UniProtKB/Swiss-Prot annotation:
Taxonomic lineage from the root: Eukaryota, Metazoa, Chordata, Craniata, Vertebrata
Region described as Disordered: spans on this chain: 635-657
EC top class, as a word: translocase
Listed Polar residues bias regions: 641-652
Domain ABC transporter as annotated: residue spans: 391-627, 1033-1271
More about this protein: PGP isoforms differ in their drug transport capabilities: PGP1 and PGP2 can mediate MDR, while PGP3 apparently cannot.
Residue numbers carrying Phosphoserine: S22
Any one GO MF annotation of this record: ATP binding
Species for this entry: Cricetulus griseus (Chinese hamster)
Protein name: Multidrug resistance protein 2
PANTHER family assigned to the protein according to its UniProt record, in alphabetical order: ATP-BINDING CASSETTE SUBFAMILY B MEMBER 1 (PTHR43394:SF28), ATP-DEPENDENT PERMEASE MDL1, MITOCHONDRIAL (PTHR43394)
Cell location: Membrane
Entries under PROSITE patterns matching the protein: ABC_TM1F (PS50929), ABC_TRANSPORTER_1 (PS00211), ABC_TRANSPORTER_2 (PS50893)
EC number annotated for this UniProt entry: 7.6.2.2
Residue spans, topological domain Cytoplasmic: 1-51, 346-708, 993-1276
Gene (name only): PGY2
């Protein structure tokens, strides 16, 4: 309750007040975990019933051992009495006859006791099943709810919350931390109550059977309890720190994998590995400290336990010799207290797992409890029957939550009449996109009012508000599904006819119909299978299908080529009819027909009016237009025939999509996409169909830690041997009382044996500490190394591997988080436990064969049944672990996609759809969990019950052997305690089955990825590294299809050449293969036929790292990393330490220095996840600075200035022109004014070069290029 009250009290606090921590918050920070009952906050009545029944069953199961000890004590007295009567009385016939009577009586008594054992065993068979299966069922049901609640809570947060939280950590928590909660609230709690019940029942039996001896032993118990409590407290603290470090590492991995093209292009793999390794190192150090602390406590606990044995037998002997207690009473008390104290040892691992779960639940429940100030799921707020679309911004002030010190809007006033189109113009970062975000209520203004039809939008229902708004953003986000489904995200229940209509309006219909699966084509992660222009057109169709009252176009045509833009612009003009529209555009030709054009400067509007009015005012707008117009003036020549050019233009429009090629576009896996979707389960099954790794295979992963493992195994063997040694000492004490020695001799012998117990305790203290420390350290080193090596192997793969839908960011981060942890789970403390149990049982059997082979053979016959049940459990759980892993990867993909693209999800009001998809993806893991509960319950109960049945067989047969003078009772007890306690330990080893099963699956994945050598190996040291690069590039008859879409040709015999220092411009319609040329030069892929040459050498012969080091790239949609601006720019050259002077020089050249200097933290300002804290233009300029700092020999500019405003573009274009001097440069641009000065312009169509020449030469040809220029010029 304390946890829940704490968070409800803080729910209404602004999450932005991150810097100010109250004392209460500081206290929370020091002890961040959830209350015990708070862990079960999502249990319904059925879950509670399962938990209550499971707990009752666990309590009954726990009482079975102490109950057994009562039977055992009475049985021991019968044995002792009979043996004392049998062995000395063998002198004459009458005494022999008397012995036979006693022997017969002993066998009858033992038969009765055997029935008691069997009855208890039958009870255990039932209650152990209920205990395990019911707790697993309750956990499975609650975890399903927690996953859904947590995902709902993430979907419910406002954008400002995401600005100050690491998205990568959220995905790690959704997979890793929820799994920890699952471990903590399942069968381990049943085991906990079982151990508690055993402890309490054992002491009750002890007091009833002999209160004096029990009190003496109890004197040691508080010390054992105190050490356990201290251990649990320290463990919780270390666990939370470890989780935080792994969450940070997971965030780094996700960020890197999501931006893999950027990382590979700039050779950033080693830098990212270092960044990842830094967080892993922190987690490893905490984990080692945790292992040391834990095992000191365990060592102390065993020392105290053995000290209590010594005390018990020393005092017990005096009680027997004084005839106060019988031997049976002493043993009943001793064994009851023994099992009671052992149960404390069993409590400790369960407390550890529960402590881990409480630490993991803290952050998860904290997010679930966080109530956003803008609640997109709220049903409150006004829902007007009709919306006219009158908009007003009144004295609006705003700062972004993550940079509250920087004011973006400083008193914005703007009115938009219903049906009007208002264009917002101004330089990058002046607040245009912010205005659009405030209208969608992604943020609330810090001051002022935004209203629709005179009503403050804060009083309107959030979902209703967003549903009446259609948005097309500067960098459109598509989801990893089909084209039709992506458009359907615009509006639920939309018909196929409406989808086709919207697609035609967005000029996307033709290219879609050319694809093999048309509307059922998969677009890939973030739409990666399509070109920028194709993505943009689908995004426009998605907005149009919404039929919105208000249309927001934020650079909606920025990624389109000239021809497509003309048609789409016409479609948008048509779509704007009758709608209130706000347009943001740097290309001013697209806004000249707006009813009102508003000029932004310094966070306020400084001028308003239509195109003609503002041109007369000679203000900001006029200046921008003049700059752009001058840039677009082209010498068309007096012979330019307008009608002819129109004809060619119209031909081009229809020709444009005759090419089946699609650019990055055509990339990867549209072919067969529908079949992929249908056959996903089959393909994934094949993917997973790798031979499961053997135990030795898993051990090999840890082989570099062999010194730790050797010491750990030796200590585990010693600890395992302690139980058989205990059996020898224990049976020796029994023998003292069955022999007819004088009391003094008996006391001396018992004192000696008690001293042995004390020595064993001291040995255990040392060996348990070293066992835990060495295995703990080896486990942490293994986890760190495996995570590092898997991540390294991922970064080694070529781009085609990442194109595969099975290797999405979500799937890879899920594997990265879970695989290493699963292997560690089987190799650290689990391996220690297995080694200990094998040594225990093995040594026990050997000793038992020496002292009583007949009884040993009977027990060895029973043992395979126990082992068989463990093997069955492992096999079934192994299959379940594989299924769980695969299915949770599916849900991980959905969650990652939704969280990474949260702004788009919110704008489209599709939070509920993603929740439904996520909930649906959890159904199979959920059903598997329920099935696994029953299987685990059956195998566990059988294993536990077999112990009791073995007691019955052992003592029944033992009675026969004693009665027939084949064995002494002392030896029966030795064999019994050595073999049966060893078998109990082996039975407990079956609880390792789920961990070992998971480890086998995970190890197979790890080994497979580590052994996978890509065809283009980024880490390879092979290949030529010429001393000098001139920069001559030649493509000779290059044929290329993307690996995941082999049936769609992209380049069909492309040949082109650019000489050293020349600038080559590639033009053509969207999807014609322009960006493919750049990707082949970067060696993201290799051509299927033909050759790419660099300075006359085939690039396949060149060292990949060397090649990429000489290339600088600026992409159409630049990706920045969540670090400082300086670090992002320095990322351009990862081969050295880039100085601050170089960073600033590159920033000045890219026209971003002045903006950076205006920020409070200047170059140390963090840019946010994927650069979300910056405008599109600002991101682009930082990306340009990043490329320039590289000082490349060859510069690749793929729409490098597409996101810039006119003013910035002019300056940056000059910077790029200057940067091109002395360098070979390949430019891709839709804005033809930016490439007029190129040495060579190549027009690509159908994957081939159709025209080439200079600007003037191509104009003179009056071909495709001429018509494109004409179309662009006509619109100015």
């Amino acid at each position: 309750m304390e946890f829940e009250e704490d968070f409800s009290a803080r729910a209404d606090k602004d999450f932005l007040k991150m810097g100010r921590k109250s004392k209460k918050e500081k206290k929370e920070k020091e002890n961040p975990n959830v209350g015990i009952f708070g862990m079960f906050r999502y249990a319904d009545w059925l879950d509670k019933l399962y938990m209550v029944l499971g707990t009752l069953a666990a309590v009954l199961h726990g009482t079975s051992l102490p109950l057994l000890m009562l039977v055992f004590g009475n049985m021991t007295d019968s044995f002792t009495k009979a043996e004392t009567s049998i062995w000395p009385n063998m002198t004459n016939q009458s005494e022999i006859n008397n012995t036979e009577v006693i022997s017969g009586s002993l066998e009858e008594d033992m038969a009765t006791y055997a029935y008691y054992y069997t009855g208890i065993g039958a009870g255990v068979l039932i209650v152990a099943y209920i205990q395990v299966s019911f707790w697993c069922l309750a956990a499975g049901r609650q975890i399903n709810k927690i996953r859904q609640k947590f995902f709902h809570a993430i979907m419910n947060q406002e954008i400002g919350w995401f600005d100050v939280h690491d998205i990568g950590e959220l995905n790690t928590r959704l997979t890793d931390d929820v799994s920890k909660i699952n471990d903590g609230i399942g069968d381990k709690i049943g085991m906990f109550f079982q151990s508690i019940a055993t402890f309490l029942a054992a002491f009750i039996v002890g007091f009833i059977s002999g209160w004096k001896l029990t009190l003496v032993i109890l004197a040691v118990s508080p010390l054992i309890g105190l050490s356990s409590a201290m251990w649990a407290k320290v463990l919780t603290s270390f666990t939370n720190k470890e989780l935080q470090a792994y969450a940070k590492a997971g965030a780094v991995a996700e960020e890197v994998l999501a931006a893999i093209r950027t990382v590979i292009a700039f050779g950033g793999q080693n830098k990212e590995l270092e960044r990842y390794n830094k967080n892993l190192e922190e987690a490893k150090n905490v984990g080692i400290k945790k292992a040391v602390t834990a095992n000191i406590s365990i060592g102390i606990a065993y020392l105290l336990v053995y000290a209590s044995y010594a005390l018990a037998f020393w005092y017990g002997t005096s009680l027997v010799l004084s005839n106060e207690y019988s031997v049976g009473q002493v043993l009943t008390v001793f064994f009851s207290i023994l099992f009671g104290t052992f149960s404390i040892g069993h409590i400790a691992p369960n407390i550890e797992v529960f402590a881990n779960a409480r630490g993991a639940a803290y952050e998860i429940f904290k997010i679930i409890d966080n109530e956003p100030s803008i609640d997109s799921f709220s049903t409150q707020g006004h829902k007007p029957d009709s919306v006219m679309g009158n908009l007003e911004f009144k004295n609006v002030h705003f700062s972004y939550p993550s940079r509250s010190g920087i004011k973006i809007l400083k008193g914005l006033n703007l009115k938009v009449q219903s049906g009007q189109t208002v264009a917002l113009v101004g330089k990058s970062g002046c607040g245009k996109s912010t205005t659009v975000q405030l209208l969608q209520r992604l943020y609330d203004p810090t001051e002022g009012v935004v209203s629709i039809d005179g009503q403050d939008i804060r009083t309107i229902n959030v979902r209703y508000l967003r549903e009446i708004i259609g948005v097309v953003s500067q960098e459109p986000v598509l989801f990893a599904t089909t084209i039709a489904e992506n458009i359907r995200y615009g509006r639920e229940n939309v018909t196929m006819d409406e989808i086709e209509k919207a697609v035609k309006e967005a000029n996307a219909y033709d290219f879609i119909m050319k694809l093999p699966h048309k509307f059922d084509t998969l677009v890939g992660e973030r739409g990666a299978q399509l070109s920028g222009g194709q993505k943009q057109r689908i995004a426009i169709a998605r907005a149009l299908v919404r039929n919105p009252k208000i249309l927001l176009l934020d650079e909606a045509t920025s990624a389109l080529d000239t021809e497509s833009e003309a048609v789409v612009q016409a479609a948008l003009d048509k779509a704007r009819e009758g709608r209130t529209t706000i347009v943001i555009a740097h290309r001013l030709s697209t806004v000249r027909n707006a009813d009102v054009i508003a000029g932004f400067d310094g966070g306020v509007i400084v001028e308003q009016g239509n195109h003609e009015e503002l041109m007369k005012e000679k203000g900001i707008y006029c200046r921008l237009v003049m700059m752009q117009t001058r840039g677009n003036e082209v010498e068309l020549g007096s012979e330019a025939d307008g009608s002819q050019s129109d004809t060619i233009a119209s031909e081009l429009t229809s020709e444009e999509f005759k090419s089946p090629s699609v650019r990055k576009s055509t990339c990867r896996s549209i072919c067969g996409s529908q079949d992929q979707e249908r056959r996903v389960s089959v393909k994934e099954a094949q993917d997973e169909d790798v031979p499961l790794v053997s135990f030795w295979g898993i051990l090999k992963l840890n082989i570099t830690e062999w010194p730790y493992l050797v010491v750990g195994v030796l200590c585990a063997v010693i600890n395992g041997c302690m139980q058989p040694v205990f059996s020898i000492v224990f049976s020796g004490i029994i023998g003292v009382f069955t022999r007819d020695d004088d009391p003094k001799t008996k006391q001396q012998n018992c004192n000696l044996f008690s001293l042995f117990f004390l020595v064993m305790g001291m040995i255990c203290f040392v060996t348990y500490f070293f066992q835990g420390f060495t295995f703990g350290k080896a486990g942490e080193i293994l986890t760190k190394r495996l995570r590092y090596m898997v991540f390294k192997s991922m970064l080694r793969q070529d781009i085609s591997w990442f194109d595969d839908h099975r290797n999405s960011t979500g799937a890879l981060t899920t594997r990265l988080a879970s695989d290493a942890a699963n292997v560690k789970g089987a190799m650290s403390s689990r391996l220690a436990g297995i080694t200990q149990n094998v040594a225990n049982l093995g040594t026990g059997i050997i000793i038992s064969l020496v002292y009583g082979w007949q009884l040993t053979l009977l027990l060895v016959v029973i043992a395979p049944l126990i082992i068989l049940s463990g093997m069955m459990e492992m096999k079934v759980l192994s299959g379940q672990a594989l299924k769980d892993k695969k299915e949770l990867e599916v849900s991980g993909k959905i969650a990652t996609e939704a969280i990474e693209n949260f702004r788009t999800v919110v704008s489209l009001t599709r939070e509920q759809k993603f929740e439904n998809m996520y909930a649906q993806s959890l159904q199979i893991p959920y059903r598997n969990a329920l099935k696994k509960a029953h299987v685990f319950g059956i195998t566990f109960s059988f294993t536990q019950a077999m112990m009791y049945f073995s007691y019955a067989a052992c003592f029944r047969f033992g009675a026969y052997l004693v009665a027939h003078q084949i064995m002494t009772f002392e030896n029966v007890m030795l064999v019994f305690s050595a073999v049966v306690f060893g078998a109990i330990a082996a039975g407990n080893a079956s609880s390792f089955a789920p961990d070992y099963a998971k480890a086998k699956v995970s190890a197979s994945h790890i080994i497979r990825i580590m052994e996978k050598i890509p065809s283009i190996d980024s880490y390879s040291t092979r290949g030529l590294k010429p001393n000098w690069l001139e920069g001559n590039v030649k493509f000779n008859e290059v044929v290329f299809n993307y690996p995941t879409r082999p049936d769609i040709p992209v380049l069909q015999g492309l040949s082109l050449e650019v000489k050293k220092g020349q600038t080559l411009a590639l033009v053509g319609s969207s999807g014609c293969g322009k960006s493919t040329v750049v990707q082949l030069l970067e060696r993201f892929y290799d051509p299927m036929a033909g050759t790419v040459f660099l300075d006359g050498k085939e690039i396949k012969q060149l060292n990949v790292q060397w090649l990429r080091a000489h290339l600088g790239i600026v992409s159409q949609e630049p990706i920045l990393f969540d670090c400082s601006i300086a670090e992002n720019i320095a990322y351009g050259d990862n081969s050295r330490v880039v100085s601050q002077d170089e960073i600033e020089r590159a920033a000045k050249e890219a026209n971003i220095h002045q903006f950076i200097e205006s920020l409070p933290d200047k170059y140390n300002t963090r840019v946010g996840d994927k650069g979300t804290q910056l405008s599109g233009g600002q991101k682009q300029r930082i990306a340009i600075a990043r490329a320039l700092v590289r000082q490349p020999h060859i510069l690749l500019l793929d729409e490098a200035t597409s996101a810039l405003d006119t003013e910035s573009e002019k300056v940056v274009q000059e910077a790029l022109d200057k940067a091109r001097e002395g360098r070979t440069c390949i430019v891709i641009a839709h804005r033809l004014s930016t490439i007029q000065n190129a040495d060579l312009i190549v027009v690509i169509q159908n994957g081939k070069v159709k025209e080439h020449g200079t600007h003037q030469q191509l104009l003179a040809q009056k071909g495709i290029y001429f018509s494109m220029v004409q179309a662009g010029a006509k619109r100015l």
